[in-house]
Amino acid sequence: MALNGIDISSWQSGINLAVVPCDFVVIKATEGINYVNPDYMRAYEQAKTVGKCLGIYHYANGGNIQSEADYFLANVGNRLGEAILILDWEAGNNASFGSCDYAWCKSWLDYVYSKTGVHPILYCSQSISYKFDNIGNYGLWIAQYANNDPTGYQDAPWNEGEYTCAIRQYTSCGRLSGYAGNLDLDKFYGSKEDWGKYAVSDKTNVVVPEQPETPKPATASPEGSILDLVYKTMLGEFGNGEDRIWNLGTRYEEIQNFINHIWVTSTDNLAQEVLSGRYGNGDVRKTVLGSRYEAVQDQVNAGNAQYYTVQSGDTLSGIAFKYGTSY
């Protein structure tokens, strides 16, 4: 028995969950300690009204564990028992990623359980899932993509069965009727009753933190193409954590999703995207791809060898620009 579903953030604001086919919907609620998805409550209430299984997630910034957990729980509010609670652990805009993955996540999960009696689920990419083998009584939601080709729901996602997880996210390029754009597609390994077991509390008296002050409104959004803004973000012009959220305003989700895509996508797929022009050339490409640059560029060069006879007046920079590479 399995369920098909989607996960959404403000990037899909306004999506009509009454017409998009899905058994469950996981909705981004919060990030850090100062961001609430502006479409969170609308999407949640609509999904609830049309009978979807529900999940709510917090995107970690890797700051103070208790503060981030309390902020999330305050915005979960009276939805406890209705929705699965989830921690989203990714590299983008996360100060603790790579340095204390297990310790941070385990502490956050334990704290949320102590306050709610609900065992949250942990989302992470397959490449770091081994770090959470002994995470305790918390399910894993693992992201691993075969490629970036458009796809509908899959009965048997690539690499299924190679590891155990509660939920598998297998594409960020899902295409479903009722929505004109890409969606994250997921498979839950269980029934609706099993989903409900993840959401239910095993405590009788639960007190969640009070609702925090309404977050300050986002600043005016910076202008520019997504590649230009990602480049500036990687250079540090918009800061990290709460500063990045504030400075990017309504462009934040768009930019952060682009950066996160680079972290989780395979080298082969990134190389294909380089050839399509998605990451620009020269210093822009090198900066945007970050630590993935060398492996991706090697793949591009290996599969796209070209030869050029130097002419009088040529420069290395000019040749590199012409062929979309570096020197």
Residue ranges and their predicted role:
Residues 246, 287, 317:
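Residues within the helices of the helix-turn-helix
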Residues 67, 127-137:
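Glycine-rich, charge-decorated loop segments at or immediately adjacent to ligand/cofactor-binding or catalytic sites
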Residues 223-238, 266-279, 303-326:
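Primarily a LysM-type cell-wall glycan-binding module
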Residues 211-222, 260-268, 287-308:
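Primarily N-terminal secretory
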Residues 1-19, 135-220:
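Functionally critical loop-and-helix segments that line ligand-binding/catalytic clefts
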Residues 250-254, 281, 291-298, 312-327:
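LysM (lysin motif) carbohydrate-binding repeats in extracellular/periplasmic proteins that recognize
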Residues 117-130, 142:
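Aromatic-lined carbohydrate-recognition surfaces of secreted/lumenal glycan-active proteins
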Residues 1-118:
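Substrate-binding cleft of extracellular glycoside hydrolase catalytic domains
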